[in-house]
């Protein structure tokens, strides 16, 4: 099958040849899979076209967790009646997908966004988490399930004392209908199989382009001074105004949490807006998102964690072959959200070098 046909048929002409990386790998059960994985930071980030299984043609498309974007002007005109913002858990994105051969599922494979098969480091973490009945759900519904692997054992930058090593369902892709699942479908799956879901933190109501924060979870609200926010009178005339307000709310919560608990509470919130914008919208506290003061160390650390998630057990061998592999990887990922001049600045490079020398845990 030609690469152009793959791009047109499976990636909706939204990627280019340079965005697809060819792979041939052996799974944990010894199956050989060959195909292409997408590295473009859009809705197809990490998605794969598997061309061959065990050296035989067996075409199948696996949708990954889409790139989660900040607010931008391209979505300003979107009108919606409801937006539910869930907690943005700070961990590793894990995707479970079915591998088919001759019409039968022969293996359910976990991966991270940028890998075909999860690294041994991730497999070892998953052994410490409750993964049942994920494999059974994938097989029964012909579905790709997406989780956040988070908790004290997989702590990145946000301390989460409520979990040791847990999986929370954050997305799903129905292979049968070729569609990313809605919040209601995710909630139904979670309820039926007692899967964890991220906390629902902020509920927004909309009407004809106007938006109002209808409710805030007690998880956040207990840290807010009630006289500084009135949920019934905050009417926003645009998504831009709404997201700016949410940033301030999250910043205030984090400051109060730090004063009381000694640590910040949240990295931000995420809304599943597949129907409205064809993807996910994230909002982070002001102190995390601000770019004009340089790239926050927390953002650089997140990309370093991703590097470990993807290459963990292979880092030493990679470094011997390419000493700049780590820096190039982190810079490439940072460039998706930050201006290239800031990414290439000496300040950013110094932070990356300092973090590289830090212990993994």
Model-predicted segments: where are they?
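Core nucleotide-handling region used for phosphoryl-transfer chemistry
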Residues: 1-361
């Amino acid at each position: 099958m030609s690469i152009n046909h793959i791009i047109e048929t499976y990636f909706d002409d939204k990627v280019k040849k340079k965005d697809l990386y060819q792979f041939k790998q052996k799974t944990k059960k010894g199956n050989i899979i060959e195909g292409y994985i997408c590295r473009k930071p859009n809705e197809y980030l990490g998605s794969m076209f598997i061309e061959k299984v065990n050296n035989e043609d067996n075409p199948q498309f696996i949708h990954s967790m889409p790139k989660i974007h900040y607010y931008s002007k391209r979505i300003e005109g979107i009108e919606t009646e409801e937006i539910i913002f869930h907690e943005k858990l700070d961990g590793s994105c894990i995707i479970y997908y079915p591998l088919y051969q001759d019409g039968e599922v022969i293996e359910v494979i976990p991966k991270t966004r940028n890998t075909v098969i999860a690294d041994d480091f991730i497999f070892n973490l998953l052994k410490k988490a409750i993964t049942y009945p994920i494999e059974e759900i994938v097989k029964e519904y012909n579905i790709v399930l997406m989780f956040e692997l988070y908790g004290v054992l997989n702590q990145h930058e946000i301390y989460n004392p409520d979990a040791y090593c847990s999986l929370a369902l954050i997305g799903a892709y129905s292979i049968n209908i070729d569609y990313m699942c809605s919040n209601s479908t995710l909630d139904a799956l979670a309820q039926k199989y007692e899967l964890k879901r991220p906390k629902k933190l902020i509920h927004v109501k909309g009407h004809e382009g106007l938006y109002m924060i209808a409710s805030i979870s007690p998880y956040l609200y207990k840290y807010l001074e009630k006289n500084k926010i009135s949920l019934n009178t905050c009417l926003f005339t645009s998504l831009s105004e709404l997201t700016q307000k949410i940033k301030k709310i999250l910043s205030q919560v984090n400051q109060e949490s730090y004063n009381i608990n000694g640590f910040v509470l949240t990295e931000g919130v995420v809304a599943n807006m597949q129907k409205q914008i064809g993807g996910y919208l994230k909002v982070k506290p002001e102190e995390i998102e601000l770019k004009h003061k340089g790239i926050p160390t927390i953002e650089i650390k997140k990309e370093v964690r991703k590097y470990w998630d993807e290459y963990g057990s292979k880092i030493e061998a990679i470094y011997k072959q390419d000493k700049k592999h780590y820096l190039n990887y982190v810079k490439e990922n940072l460039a998706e959200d930050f201006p290239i001049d800031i990414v290439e600045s000496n300040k950013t490079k110094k932070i990356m070098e300092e973090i590289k020398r830090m212990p993994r845990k």
